[in-house]
Amino acid sequence: MRRILLIPFIVHTALASAQDTIPLNDLSFWKPNEVQNWKIVADVTADLEEDDAMKPTKGTGVVANLPTTKNRNNLISVAEYGDVEVSFDFMMARNSNSGFYLQGRYEVQLFDSWGQQHPAFSDCAGIYARRRWNPDAELFDGHAPRLNACLAPGLWQHLEIAFQAPRFDATGKKIANARLLKVVLNGATVHENLELTGPTGGPISEQEATKGPFMIQGDHGPVAFRNFHIVDKSGEPVNVGKFTYKVINGNFRYPEDFANKKADKTGTTDQLTWEVAGKNDGFANIFNGSFTAPKTGNHHIVLQAAGKSSLLIDGKEILGDQWTYVADQRSADITLSKGPHTIEIVNYKMDGWMSPFLGLWIAAPGAGPTALHSMGSVLALEASDPITLDAAKPTVFRSFMDVTLPNSVRGDKNFLNIKNPNSKRVVHAVQEGDPTRLHYTYDLDNGAVVQLWKGDFLNTSPMWDNRGDGSSRPRGAILPLDDIQTVVTKDRLFDLTTAQNDPVHGFKPLGYDLDEMGYPTFRYTLSGTEIADKIRVSAGKTLNRSLTFTNGAQNSAAQVVRLAVGKKIEKSGDNLWTVDDKRYFIQTTGGAKPVLESTGGISVLFLPANSNVEWTILW
């Protein structure tokens, strides 16, 4: 049976559109507040052990809510927004509670939900419920996040929201509900195309409107924000005219193969669609049309086509002739003057195994993307449903894993040079899934934990669908680490290459053993020393590592254990350290005193190797 699938896409234009960055040098972006619970500070820290404990440092760049019994007002923006994209970093104190309101009416919950296994609408990034008629009435219509991507209190987290305001007719009657087009917490999509039937609990008004201010709750507990970026999407979109088209039948490799051929079919169409060809492959479609830019400024173009395609505006090549897979998007930014512009789109395809697809979006300054294609043109045939693997019990899964490495030095043969220069395919990777929904990838070639993630376990479609490529993908919020040896000789403390580049000391993986519960302990040798790397997850919050050195332990005297590598590592408490601007915590046990050394912009936190070294990653 063939299934028709609308390939999922959301055209992101925020990074390419004009952004407003809220300058947190003062509180001028926000309405004057009679009480003083909101402060401009340089940074904050939150205690992992004490509820509602947050301490500021003097300076600018962060806005923090530090409520007292008397001072606990909300923060409301001066500016009002309709359709908008907004992103920011935030930090929660332990067991603290806040909320970010779109238009002062629709709350995205902010809460210390660290380790919560089954999140509700009241957990972090949940959409808070509505109340019937009065503040004391029952709750209804709340929306829990798809997964719990919340980090530990005291760490900076990141939230991205794409919001579409409700629509009203000329009489003021609501004709379309507000929508959250997408909500992303710490890199994990937690809501998508979510309809909001009305204001959630605690709004500035139950009456909906075309525009409204941002509001941040300040009456519950300490919370801090920084790096606010706003893209107002309420502007006028481009106006698109009709298209003429030519269809040339045949299998073509290059534009010159059909440049001088007579068209087999011509016509006009209101919207772009590959369907004018009348078949799925063996065609070249050439479209010519026009659109009107509502004002002068940057326009963001996104083209998604199966096969080869190109795009010209006013006769200038914007996207050159290039082959792309059906799900791949290409984009460009171009400054256009107000008024009419010509456009030409070429799409030719001879790949019978791939479904046809043609989509084009243009976002004018301050407006969302306008689709120039028909809905039928962005439907594709998909052979199978996603193949996923869950971890109802401790689960070990072997596959390739593509990872992003923040600090590793390029040069390893497995680095990928395509889209992300710091991405790498780990070929001897072990994926360990835990029922508490904190999982990790271990590289047997380096004795390294290269990433952690929160949420569901694996998407194995890349491995098992059709021919596959042997890889799997995490399903959740990811903490990238580095694919470098955990244990090295002291002279290699700042060597961020892999064990393959250290043949002298003889790193040799020995595989892993499983205990009675199914948890692995990894084993390898280095300079004649046998090392057992026991890794256990606790409560979905922490990853605990214990290294035991045996046989040839005299050689371990010259070795060190790298607990963390980063650009910025700071001590934040007894046996507690933060890495890379509070991205995650490192905690040592047993009275061990880690050493911190830095050079060339890289810091390493390490302990001398002895019979046993233990530490914990809190994230």
Please give the residue ranges for each predicted region.
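Short strand-turn-strand beta-turns centered on an Asx-Gly dipeptide
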Residues: 176, 184-188, 192, 304, ...
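Solvent-exposed beta-strand/loop surfaces of large extracellular or lumenal domains
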Residues: 194-204, 271, 313-332, 570-605
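Short, hydrophobic/aromatic-enriched beta-strand segments in well-ordered soluble domains
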Residues: 90, 160-163, 344-348, 522-526, ...
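Bacterial Sec-dependent N-terminal signal peptides
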Residues: 1-19
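Carbohydrate-interacting regions of secretory-pathway proteins
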Residues: 19-260, 266-274, 279-288, 292, ...
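Acidic/polar, compositionally biased interaction segments
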Residues: 194, 234-393
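Beta-strand-rich N-terminal accessory domains
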Residues: 20, 78, 379-544, 555-583, ...
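Short, well-ordered beta-strand segments enriched in hydrophobic/aromatic residues
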Residues: 86, 90, 543-551
